[in-house]
Amino acid sequence: MAGFASANLLERVPEDEVLPAEFTVKAPPETDIWAKPPSTERFNAPILYKSIPLDTFKRARVAFSANWSQKYDQGGLIIVLNGNSGDRKWVKTGIEFTHDKPHLSTVAKDRWADWSLLPVPSGGTGATLEVVREPDDSLWIYLIQGVQKSPIREVTWVFAEEDVRDAWIGVYAARPSSAGGDLVVNFASLIIEVTDSTTK
């Protein structure tokens, strides 16, 4: 598996395959990953990722936190499917600040994006999430709390996509608001696992 690359990221990307146990991703204001009819398409948020063949993906996990303060502040894990024809589909899961507090948030974008929310456990500002390719080829998203693994979302279509050039697996941060300066998201213990058993 190749090393890390980035999109929309100003910081230097590690040249080898190893990230520090803890690292940050900084999102400037007016950055987002979103798609809503009739014509909203935004994909300018910083992403740190590894590029893999989609059919090799097994799972990804990360712990993360931030001082979420502006509406729609967000960060977490992301999977991007880059199509051979230039189209792009994606799934992102993390924490998003909305309705005056942080929520566990998952958005899946096929033609357009949907969005689901759950409370953050204990009303906190951090979480550990894992995305897994299950034996039935669904993508499942889990909240990890110690030894407890709680399912929070199933996305059925990801591994049924046929016209995929490559997949980006990694982390992202976004601050759609124009206020508040940069959003800094703290990440720890990122794991990216593929079928050849190569990990981070």
From Swiss-Prot:
Induction: Up-regulated when grown with elevated levels of potassium chloride.
Keywords: Stress response
Family annotation (Pfam families): DUF1349
Example GO BP: cellular response to osmotic stress
Nuclease in keyword set: no
Statement: the UniProt record of this protein carries the keyword Calcium: no
Physiological role: Involved in osmoadaptation.
Protein name, per record: Uncharacterized protein AN7484
Organism name: Emericella nidulans (strain FGSC A4 / ATCC 38163 / CBS 112.46 / NRRL 194 / M139)
